Amino acid sequence: MQVSLDRLPLGIPAVVLQVGCKQELRCRLRDFGLVPGTEVVTRYRSPDRGVTALEFRDTVIALRTRDLKGVRVEWK
């Protein structure tokens, strides 16, 4: 099943298919290592859903949930 990364349920592994964000954000995500083919797991969402913690490449980072809408992933 394909969804945007902001809608991926907690704890479900997925693979990044596309990073379709604005150039500046796309570069930032690429610098973190979030590129097509990367396996990612959503680990935490703040109570107001404004921040999401992601685990990928042995790292956990927290990003604004709204910034993840342009990232398409496929559940395994």
Residue ranges and their predicted role:
Residues 1-7, 62-65:
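PDZ/PDZ-like peptide-tail recognition elements
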Residues 18-22:
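A structural micro-motif recognizing beta-strand termini
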